[in-house]
């Protein structure tokens, strides 16, 4: 049985990247929360 995590840079960016987050209202909330918390890295 193969492992479940097969890393791909393109997929990672597409799904969890900054632009992907900004595209949806929920994603914008994520960015907002992470900014408020003071995260060094907002996405990926």
Swiss-Prot record:
It comes from the Bacteria. It holds the Pfam family Ribosomal_L34. The keyword Ribonucleoprotein applies. The keyword Ribonucleoprotein applies. Keywords: Ribonucleoprotein, Ribosomal protein. GO terms for molecular function: structural constituent of ribosome. One of its GO terms (biological process) is translation. Coiled coil: none annotated. Gene3D superfamilies: 1.10.287.3980. One of its GO terms (cellular component) is ribosome. PANTHER family: LARGE RIBOSOMAL SUBUNIT PROTEIN BL34M, MITOCHONDRIAL RIBOSOMAL PROTEIN 34 FAMILY MEMBER. Belongs to the bacterial ribosomal protein bL34 family. NCBIfam families: rpmH_bact (TIGR01030). This is Large ribosomal subunit protein bL34. It comes from Dictyoglomus turgidum (strain DSM 6724 / Z-1310). The lineage of its organism: Bacteria, Pseudomonadati, Dictyoglomota, Dictyoglomia, Dictyoglomales.
